[in-house]
């Protein structure tokens, strides 16, 4: 057979070969399987990221518990990620991905509030099969969602850019709603997970707030957070948390019981920043909220500007050491989810490494 024909046939057969990566796949309630999956498909306007590190978010836990109708099994979940781009104009660059993909054309996108875009989708939630989440060796992302990181920012640490942006956005929204500086406020942070700790670090190390109380029923997490900023660390039922005693409350939990406590303990004229999404409904003391002019604000994700500023915050180490992050192998990700579920994990953030 002619040599040129042989080469052509080899090229055709090679181009049809299925390229396989490893991924952690959500397959059902409290079930994750580490298995082979097809590589993401190269698409116009997108680039392929070789994942370096990916963080487990509270919303990933919601999916794990079967409580997120937007994340339908089987699905590669995960959206907090850092890595190296494999193709296109960013090829070879160390980057993080903004997982919130928006239309860029609506009134929100054109006015700096991209996170409220009615057409938004999220990596690891509601994208097509071939472009799913980041608990994998590879993931595809629109080029406009790619953010380069400076060489001195470790990619392991860069992986928490997304939750840090969530916390920064919440703190800035709270700051704008207050009638006095954050540095003068008595602050309650409900929840000793990653968002709770990141809010506290931004409040204390960037905003000069040294009067923070953090509450959580999990003693392991609470004692771990106590290593990283000065404050009081208590159980939600502790006597330290008195009615009408806090200028601002950050609810990073989002349970009915945490909302009830937030409205009870906030001062007249105070501010509640609601970040957590665990329970979507429940009782709330609207009488107090009305008669005492309490400001209740839900905060969702972050703007593009918040995301850019977060990379600078991490690169400049403005929130201190990040040795509270715990790293696990992606292939052992199912075990990490189980430990977060049963409360035996003390770290506020687990990051998975492929």
Stretches with model-predicted labels:
Residues 6-7:
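Cysteine-centered motifs
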Residues 40-54, 68-110, 150-152:
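Glycine-rich beta-strand-centered segment in the early N-terminal region that forms part
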Residues 53, 250-252:
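Short, well-ordered coil/turn residues at beta-beta hairpins
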Residues 105-190:
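NAD(P)H dinucleotide-binding glycine-rich loop of Rossmann-like/cofactor-binding domains
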Residues 153-237:
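Mid-domain Rossmann-like dinucleotide-binding core that forms the NAD(H)/NADP(H) cofactor-binding site
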Residues 241-249:
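A short acidic, Gly/Pro-enriched loop at the edge of an enzyme's catalytic core
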Residues 256-316, 354:
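Glycine-rich phosphate-binding loop and adjacent beta-alpha segment
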Residues 260, 304, 308-354:
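C-terminal hydrophobic helical "lid"/dimerization subdomain
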